[in-house]
Amino acid sequence: MRSLVAQEKFRNIGLIARSESEQALYSLRQLIHFLHGRDCTVILDKHIIGHLPEMGLQAASASQMGEACDLVIVVGGDGSLLGAARTLARYKVPVLGVNRGHLGFLTDILPSEIESRVGQVLDGEYSTEKRFLLDLEVRRGRTVVGEGSALNDIVLLSGDSVHMIDFELMIDGHFVYGQRSDGLIVSTPTGSTAYALSGGGPIMHPKLDAMVLVPLNPHTLTSRPLVVAGDSEIKIHITTEKVRPLVSCDGTEGIRLQVDDVIAIRKKPHRLHLIHPPGHDFYQACRSKLGWSSRPGDNN
């Protein structure tokens, strides 16, 4: 993380939120009034413009925001930010999160602090982190049958079946193992506090240039999470015949697989520019979100 104090100040701001969340829409209205008071140009996600017709704002897709805005604010949970990140990363537009969800590792501004914390960011008081994403390609013979990207993780699952999956893992062209399990999580450091953590994987600091591979209920007790270099190329060869597994990016709708399909995973060339207000601390976030104990008398 590097500090960007009193440098770039944002004026063209895009807003993204979940339309089905009344709490998010309430915070959006508050945010719009505040931004107009700061003489900012506001562009609203086209999927929610119909829920706020009284605001009279310009509507745009996430891609259009990436081209036109110098800051995008996502109001919602980490899932909302994950969806925005997969589109916005290629445009290098900074992204700021307001938490209207659950854990909020990525959306770290509380609703009660919207005006004060967003105000600090508009004044040029913020820090930024560059988080890498993963590219997914599914190959069937010489044909690419599916693609995707993920900020958190790419997950191989058994899908609708209760049977285990058989697959072979290759890293940078080297055979690692053949495994029978319920699946495999390939996670970035960002995703290490999400599904990978539930699967027994390690917490990885966001600065790390690494990936972690976490087996899901492997049939052998010696199959443990494996941390590899961030520029590694991961290939998973599906060898199971009884099951039609799924591979999913950040929990989105999966790609159905069949025997002899090959999943190829590598780091994307573009990174997400994630903005934090002053005082952001990864370890404090872990204490708050994961219930770690604090010093006596310390509320954080």
From Swiss-Prot:
SUPFAM superfamilies: NAD kinase/diacylglycerol kinase-like. GO terms for molecular function: ATP binding; metal ion binding; NAD binding; NAD+ kinase activity. Gene3D superfamilies: Probable inorganic polyphosphate/atp-NAD kinase, domain 1, Probable inorganic polyphosphate/atp-NAD kinase, domain 2. InterPro entries: ATP-NAD_kinase_N, ATP-NAD_kinase_PpnK-typ_C, NAD/diacylglycerol_kinase_sf, NADK. GO terms for biological process: NAD metabolic process; NADP biosynthetic process. GO terms for cellular component: cytoplasm. It is found in: Cytoplasm. Its main location: cytoplasm. It catalyses: NAD(+) + ATP = ADP + NADP(+) + H(+). Disulfide bonds: none annotated. Keywords: ATP-binding, Cytoplasm, Kinase, NAD, NADP, Nucleotide-binding, Transferase. PANTHER family: NAD KINASE. Involved in the regulation of the intracellular balance of NAD and NADP, and is a key enzyme in the biosynthesis of NADP. Catalyzes specifically the phosphorylation on 2'-hydroxyl of the adenosine moiety of NAD to yield NADP. This is NAD kinase. It comes from Alcanivorax borkumensis (strain ATCC 700651 / DSM 11573 / NCIMB 13689 / SK2).
